[in-house]
Amino acid sequence: MSRRHSAEKREVNPDPKFGNIVISKFMNSIMYDGKKSVAENIVYGALDTIEAKTKQSPLSVFEQALENVMPTIEVRSRRVGGATYQVPVEVRSTRRQALGIRWIIAAARGRNEKTMTERLSAELLDASNNRGNAVKKREDVHKMAEANRAFSHYRW
């Protein structure tokens, strides 16, 4: 890993339907092999399903789900002497968002519904109500940080 230049952030265009950058990032994370149209169909299908089920704005449900999944603190390994400590550190806002998106997608892919659209809509609904595997993942990360609070003075 080069220490000379940090990679510059690329501009992400907002999605065509809602004009939302976060939804666009979400689609890009779902996408396999550059098949954006498939990813769009999955995400928009899931959001339409959410709207039909809840009679609420799908965007507000999505944002609530993401907010409930994003971690505020995580642990990072730090080597001190011969020992490796799990040191709790705060998570930057960009990483919080990326982790939240990643965890929702991973949890949706691990579900048992038939199509990805159904899985994603179910996981987003669960996450917006503080349930589901994505929220459980965040709770586990927070528990790890809480358990290792004694090492917080090793922060960098």
From Swiss-Prot:
Record flagged with keyword Transmembrane: no
Pfam family name, one: Ribosomal_S7
Gene3D superfamilies: Ribosomal protein S7 domain (1.10.455.10)
Biological-process GO terms, alphabetical: translation
GO molecular function: rRNA binding; structural constituent of ribosome; tRNA binding
One Gene Ontology term, aspect cellular component: small ribosomal subunit
Keywords from the UniProt entry: Ribonucleoprotein, Ribosomal protein, RNA-binding, rRNA-binding, tRNA-binding
Domain of life: Bacteria
Transmembrane segments annotated in the record for this chain: none
Self-association and partners: Part of the 30S ribosomal subunit. Contacts proteins S9 and S11.
Entry similarity comment: Belongs to the universal ribosomal protein uS7 family.
Function comment: One of the primary rRNA binding proteins, it binds directly to 16S rRNA where it nucleates assembly of the head domain of the 30S subunit. Is located at the subunit interface close to the decoding center, probably blocks exit of the E-site tRNA.
Stored PANTHER family: RIBOSOMAL PROTEIN S7
UniProt-recorded name of the protein: Small ribosomal subunit protein uS7
Lineage, opening ranks: Bacteria, Pseudomonadati, Pseudomonadota, Alphaproteobacteria, Hyphomicrobiales
Chain's gene name: rpsG
